[in-house]
Amino acid sequence: MKRQHLHVAVGLCSLVIAGCAVHRETRPVRIMPAGRLVVAPDSSTRFLTISAALDSARDGDTVFVMPGEYREAVKVVESRRITLLGADPATTIIDATDQYSAIELRTDSNRVSGLTLRNADSHGIWVRDGQQFIDHCVIANNGDRGVYLSSFAGFAYAHITHCTVVENGEVGIHAARDDSNTVITDCIVAFNPRGIVTDQPQGMLIVRHNCLFGNGLDYDRVTPDNSNILQDPRFADRANGDYRLRRGSPCIGAGSTAANIGTF
């Protein structure tokens, strides 16, 4: 950035102060680039908790979460666009036991990626408002919904891609509004009482290249296209929470870009 100098010469400032001259130099304004804040549970970084890093984050920052288990409820509610990026969804875990939700999102254009979100009393991810981006997450064993796009606080939408949404108490993915701004692609939604749900059956949700299996009801008021499959994803060890795909899984190479359906 070029240094700019502001020279202001003021003559005859007042009848009291005659011949007064003012010379000021303004320093260039530095526009700081978006940064990366690192969280680790072993005191090897500045931040021990995700919430502490988010408190220090600015618009456009990435909060990178090292492997470990984080027992907290995470809220991204300020007017900042944040990327919350886990190192590995198999080993980077937010355990929200006794918390309402593992992650709460408000405002536009936040991204959540590479995490396991589990054991919340209600929702794994609660989108209260705005357009959000959720990818490569395992969302499991939450008391109510895996992902809830609410309509109480405003308009909540999301692009949900390459997620594994399993064994939640009521619903895998619940979109209160049936709107084409919500896109669900390349996800496994399995072993929930209801799989993908909307409250406004207008046929607008985009639901493509997903695998649904073992839900009490796969679709509730949702109109999928024929790119979705209803087959056992063949998890490596479901009983122990290993949702990687075994050899021969119908999800291998079956995604929209010939990648795997699901997180792994």
Language model: regions and residue ranges:
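Right-handed parallel beta-helix/beta-solenoid
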Residues: 20-56, 67-69, 87-88, 233-239
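Glycine-rich beta-solenoid repeat tracts in large extracellular/virion proteins
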Residues: 54, 73-77, 101-106, 123-129, ...
